[in-house]
């Protein structure tokens, strides 16, 4: 069966209620992403004013961290989708089993990531063209961040559990508290304020892991108090069928993120051909572009949660209604942000650097990315929709194809042979965005996602 984003599958009187549900879930998730963005901006701004080379090194180490945390992404996405479907199906026993097994997976992934700490130098050495301070900053930051992985793991999975239960407000509040703590500690530890020693890059990393452990403690208290998860009824032993379902749904998303993050690392190597200044401009451009991620992330989370819930109920009309209304909201928000980015690139870039050369090379690419928010709105909507129904494999395959046939080859040719520097690399990135979003949309419109949606619903029902 073929579908359309322009067709309303719901009775007109139900559309306002669906839109209200989406906004209710999306706004706190947007708020959480705003706070995450502010944390990223603060980190980048503090380090940018401390040393732009230190800022670039930290940017590289963060990309490596995103690559190595694939199991964490699997556990997080799997928890959100399976818990949402189980709640929609009204299966309390399945919800409890999935909740406990999500806790076990959070601890397991934290241990695995922490065990990678001794390999931090090896992981950074994949970049062959690094300069001295950039290389040393990247290695120092990654070593500290990996040592504190348990806090990241618990925060990510427990927040995902709450989103699956339809609570996006609590993760926002906890993220806000931890990020404001992080910003304070960043300033104090990077520059040596309020009695702290000046620690530079190490200070930024220590501030991050301390704040994440505080957040992990708060979220642990919250999920054990929540009635939906029934965790206080007693320990449920690890159950392979529940863990397998969480990972079956979440693992393709983890591989998708691994493929994307690996592509981003390759992309960074292409940028380093153009010079360290081009890479610094890229990091700043990504932070400016993150303004559009706020609405995209929030609405995508809301779509995943509601689609999962209605899929668990077996209500296809509401699944389609959520997807259509989510796309309309995403389009409205992201195009608005895109216009702002296009019209005012320089003031946004100056938040992160005062270096005239970096500002100049960043302006045009940032303006261009503002024009392509329409495609990013499609991409984020389709991600939320397909994941909510358990269709996590097709986005993974599409991302792999798009990264390796559009982003990387186009960027390499533009940078290496046309000498276009940062602009050339971002032409490759835009080609990837257009190709990826179009393929995901075509898959949704074809109706081929329905079989997996039914399978996800039936498997969750069996977990009780």
Swiss-Prot record:
One of its GO terms (biological process) is monoatomic ion transport. It is found in: Cell membrane. One of its GO terms (molecular function) is xenobiotic transmembrane transporter activity. It is a multi-pass membrane protein. InterPro entries: MATE_fam (IPR002528), MATE_MdtK (IPR050222), MdtK-like (IPR048279). It comes from the Bacteria. Signal peptide: none annotated. This is Probable multidrug resistance protein NorM. It comes from Thermotoga maritima (strain ATCC 43589 / DSM 3109 / JCM 10099 / NBRC 100826 / MSB8). The gene is norM.
